[in-house]
């Protein structure tokens, strides 16, 4: 907040969360009367994803649709108008979304040498974790914070931790070239290979090493572990989510003949992926506990309280106002 964007002038501003962003895009969509009576028009959450993806990949929205949602190309023009309306909405209401924070910081570091110098003096060492999942603007911010060679941070004061073989967020705009090109951007960078794996057994690492050998471009490494034994890796390709769930249930039933329930776990990439398995377990009469889900700040009652505080800070925060209004009868 110390280095607020110039276009805000002296107005208060609010940083939006995901629910606010959805509400703002929906308000703009309703204002433009888009999708009325058209069941094929993309839903608000999907639109938010495409708008953010276009910014993070630094592409035009129609280019993103061409590559990733060809069936939505007929809606490219109205969706681009909606994107422009959303941009105007945020500026009018004094709102910044997550993507704004990145691009406004980059703009500050490029155009305000005094602010850039202050930040470099304040943050004398930079450590970026999961560097393989950074996008283009995040990598540029790291470079700008480091400063020009000979004038910015001393060599060795920038450290990136990551694994180019684990770049899984390209769909959000992550660019694996950021970590592959790190030694070129920071000449003299020292590469420290962390090859001992403390989590996995040898059969798992044998498969991983075999896959790594086929990479066309990477930092060569040979993973090893002191954990001997372990079951061999099995690759199973179910025909559907439900057949996968039934397969897992049968495996759990078999394991329960030899193990206690608390010794059995199923790992998921995301909480909602467990939906079919939860149904299958209930049908089989197998009790289970699910760990994970909504974060505390995303719970409805917490967001209600936060809406009051945000509205006091910024009376133009319409997503917060709408949430508060819904809590009181006779408003709206």
Segments predicted by a language model, with ranges:
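Conserved helicase C-terminal RecA-like lobe
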Residues: 68, 72, 155-158, 260, ...
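Conserved helicase NTPase motor core
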Residues: 16-21, 51, 71-181, 194-200
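Proline-centered turn/helix-capping motifs that create local helix->coil transitions or kinks
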Residues: 55-63, 149-151, 211-221
């Amino acid at each position: 907040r110390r280095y607020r964007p110039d276009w805000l002038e002296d107005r208060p501003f609010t940083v939006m969360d995901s629910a606010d962003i959805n509400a703002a895009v929906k308000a703009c969509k309703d204002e433009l009367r888009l999708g009325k009576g058209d069941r094929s028009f993309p839903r608000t959450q999907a639109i938010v994803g495409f708008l953010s993806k276009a910014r993070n990949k630094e592409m035009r929205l129609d280019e993103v649709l061409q590559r990733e949602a060809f069936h939505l190309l007929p809606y490219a023009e109205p969706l681009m108008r909606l994107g422009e309306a959303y941009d105007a909405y945020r500026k009018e209401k004094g709102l910044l979304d997550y993507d704004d924070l990145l691009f406004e910081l980059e703009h500050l570091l490029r155009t305000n040498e005094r602010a850039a110098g202050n930040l470099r003096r304040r943050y004398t060492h930079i450590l970026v974790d999961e560097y393989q999942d950074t996008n283009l603007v995040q990598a540029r911010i790291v470079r700008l914070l480091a400063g020009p060679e000979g004038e910015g941070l001393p060599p060795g004061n920038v450290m990136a931790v990551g694994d180019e073989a684990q770049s899984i967020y390209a769909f959000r705009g992550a660019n694996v070239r950021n970590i592959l090109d790190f030694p070129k951007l920071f000449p003299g960078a020292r590469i420290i290979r962390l090859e001992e794996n403390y989590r996995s057994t040898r059969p798992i690492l044998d498969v991983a090493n075999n896959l790594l050998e086929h990479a066309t471009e990477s930092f060569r490494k040979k993973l090893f572990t002191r954990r001997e034994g372990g079951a061999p890796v099995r690759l199973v390709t179910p025909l559907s989510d439900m057949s996968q769930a039934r397969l897992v249930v049968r495996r759990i039933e078999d394991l329960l003949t030899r193990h206690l329930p608390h010794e059995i776990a199923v790992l998921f990439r995301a909480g909602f992926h467990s939906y079919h398995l939860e149904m299958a377990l209930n049908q089989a009469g197998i009790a289970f506990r699910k760990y994970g889900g909504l974060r505390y700040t995303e719970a409805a009652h917490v967001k209600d309280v936060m809406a009051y505080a945000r509205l006091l800070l910024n009376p133009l925060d319409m997503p917060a106002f709408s949430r508060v209004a819904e809590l009181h009868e006779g408003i709206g």
